[in-house]
Amino acid sequence: VTVRDRVDDGDGKYHYVVNKNETMLAREKQNQMKEKFKEWLFADPERRAKYVDYYNETFNNIRLREYDGSHLQFPGMNPEIELKPHQKNAIARILLGGNTLLAHCVGAGKSFEMMAACMEQKRLGLANKTVMVVPKPLIGQTASEFLRLYPSANILVATERDFEKSRRKQFISRIATGDYDCIIMSHSQFEKIPISAERKERMLQAQIDEIAYAIDDMKSQNGEQWTVKQMESQKKKLQEQISALADESRKDDLITFEELGIDSIMVDEAHAFKNLAIFSKMNNVSGISSSGAKKATDMQLKCQYISEINGNRGIVFATGTPISNTMCEMYVMQLYLQKPALEQMGIYHFDSWAANFGEVTTALELTVEGSGFRFKSRFNKFTNLPELMNIYREVADVQTADMLDLDVPALRGGKAIIVESEPDWYVKQVMEDFVVRAERIRNGGVDPSVDNFLKITHEARLLGTDARLIDKDAPNNPDGKLNKVAENVWNEYQ
């Protein structure tokens, strides 16, 4: 809940500003109403039993399957390489359990798991053509590791030249006509393979319908005009995308992704695709982003296609950091890998997921410029966590460093050494300038294209490293971080 006051600008124009005191009081009342509702819900035994039964039947009905890969044989694998038990179990999950998230820590052997699963899928007839998508710097390493694990594997590796405009059509034709055990390419190359315009249009129209429903719902409840305006703006942007899609004539007439015969996708470092746009009626809540990356939307469309043709199998994501910044990242991973399962539970959009498994909290936080504190609302508290984790673990194979007891060198002294560095007069002066700029941004006194909080945060990080990253003529602080690092490295070297 946010209370805004209308401020007239003259000439019939006006804008809204947040009333901090009234907002605090309204949110306190909101929390009281939530507590009263909980008390009312459980006060009547019959009513309580009704909703407890509904919740258990809908969400608390999962017994997690345990996968044992000890019996697996790997024809064609290098006999000098022996996979560890947790790797065999993960491969068994991929083969038997459908879409999988390999949420394993660094050094757990995710690459070998995907490679072995890829070859076994092909051998068992579970997949005919697999594409392995990896970060650009790892293409060569992935290819050599694949051939080390399976020396006779028939793999196609995309080079940088293969996706140049003059050669792209030829390379994509090789994918369509060749019988490969695995096709290895980079994240950016994978994005250049187009998905059909019809599929894009269906997705955009579904999002527009969802927003239109939410707008009608907000209006019927006399919801905030501010929120309705934001949703109308978002709806208009999506409609413009559909129009652009209809008018678009592809510069190079490539075969679409659906026509390549690919029926399995394996994505290494899958956290690179977590920035998926999420539509929500909640506004001004940190941790929820309505703007997403184009490559994430492209990945979502391709994953939807693979799930459709394979019955919710054929997708493998691998990352050591599936959830690192916000709770929404868990929803995004579920959207990629288990959307039908969510829909079976009546969860068709983010707000429904958030209502069941999350909560918005408001607390005092340090301002961006570090000059004081402000109340900030964040979507950062899980509710019904045991049930959510059971749903998540249906696709997620989680292995932490503690679970695997990996041989990691211990820190000298058992903990990190804190080295303090004092700011000089120049750093303090720039920090004061950040305060002035932040206040101007909050009051709408500067165009966002000229200055914004993201710019201040970026400059503050640079300043925290060394002032000369912002201004090459800034004074050299002898007590600065870089000088401290250089001094410590020299002492260690001595």
Task: Label the model's feature ranges.
Residues 1-61, 127, 151, 175, ...:
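Charged, low-complexity intrinsically disordered regions
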Residues 55, 87-90, 94, 102, ...:
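Generic structural signal for small/hydrophobic residues in well-ordered secondary structure
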Residues 61-103:
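Conserved pre-motif I regulatory segment
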Residues 137-163, 170, 174-177, 337-341:
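Conserved helix-turn-beta segment of the N-terminal RecA-like "Helicase ATP-binding" lobe
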Residues 168-215, 220-222, 226-229, 233-264, ...:
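Inter-lobe coupling linker of SF2 helicases/translocases
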